[in-house]
Curated annotation (Swiss-Prot):
The gene is MTHFSD. This is Methenyltetrahydrofolate synthase domain-containing protein. Residues 245-258 have a biased composition (Basic and acidic residues). The keyword RNA-binding applies. PROSITE patterns: RRM.
Amino acid sequence: MEPRAGVSKQDIREQIWDYMESQNLADFPRPVHHRIPNFKGASRAAEHFPRLQAFKMARTIKVNPDAPQKNARFFVLESKKTLLVPTPRLRTGLFNKITPPPGATKDILRKCATSQGVRNYSTPVGLDSKVLVDLVVVGSVAVSEKGWRIGKGEGYADLEYAMMVSMGAVSQGTPVVTIVHDCQVVDIPEALLEDHDLTVDYILTPTRVITTGCERPKPAGIAWSKISCEMLGKMPILRSLRHQEEQAGKDVTLRDGPRSPPGATRSPRDLAPPELGSVPLSSVQIGNLPRDARVSELKRALSALGVAPSRLTWQGPQHGAFLHYRDPAEAQQAIACLQGFRLGANTVRVVLARQQRASDLVGSHTAEPLPDHQPAIAGP
C-alpha cells in the first residue's frame, strides 16, 4: 500500500487508518482513526526491542503511552531500566517515572506497563531533574524506510522531543525507535517534512527490523513560532521552558502572540513575593495526601507540573496543604492542572480556598469546605 501522488500528511493518515480497519488489522481501542493505531501483532513487533544494541546500552528509556507500545514499556521495566512516560497531552508536566512496587512479579510489571499502571505507579519528573534519556520510543501513524515519520496530527511526539532537547535530556545522537504494523511503512514525500518533524532511526514491525540510517537532523529545540497561545496556556511545563529560554535571551515569539524581545526579563519587583499585609493571595486547598507524604515531595511534584505556589502551608496531620498564588488566575490555572493529580497512590482533592490576605499567612487559615463526601482540611 503506497500513498498516491500529491498527497498531504492527512491523506496518508486517513489511508492508513482506513486500510487497517478494512483489513481488520486494528486492535483495541477501535476505530483507530485519530489515534496512534494499535494493531494485531504489536507484541510480536515489540519483541525486537530488547534485542537492539541501543536498548542493551540504554539506562533510561522514554516510551510513549499508546497501546501498541505496551510491551515495549514492559521490556524496559523487566530489564530494570528507568522507564519514563510522557504525561497525556503534556497537560501536567513532561515525564512520569514509572516505579514498580518492590519485588514486583512479571504480572505486576505487565500491569505497570498498561495505561492504568502508568497512572498508579508514576511520579512526576521535573525540569530540574537533570534526566538524561538514552533511547526514545514513539508511536507513528505512518513511517518510511528513510526514517520519515507522520504522527496522528497533534504534534505531541515532536513537541515532547523538542522539549527534551531544550532541557538537555537528549541530543542529536539519541536513537529514536518506532513500533508499527508492516502496512504503516510507506513512502512519504520529503516535501511534507518540516524542521520540527521528528525522524526515527529504527522501525520495528512484526516481521522486520529496519535501520533507517536517517541523516536528516532531528528538531534542535522548541520551534516557538509553531506554538500557539492556547497551547501554551494548557501546558504549564511549556510555559516554564519558555520562561527559561526567554531568560537566556532566545527568541520565544509565539505563532499568534506578541514578540518577547531577546534578553527580556521580569523586573525584580515582578518576581518578588507579595509583601505581608499588602497583597491578597488566592489559595488552593488540597487534601487526601498520602499519610507518609512529605512537604518536599509535594513541592517537587508541584514544580514538575509548573504550578509551584508563592507560598505553601503544610498540614501534614490533616493530609493536606494550602497553596498560595499571586492572583486568582494563577490559582484557577493550578486547579485545572491538578485535576486527576496523584501523589503516590492517592488522587489529590483540589478546591479553591477562600481568598486571604497575605498577612493571614502568619496566622491560621479558614478554608471553604471541600465538596460533599470529602473530608475537610482543618486549619493549623
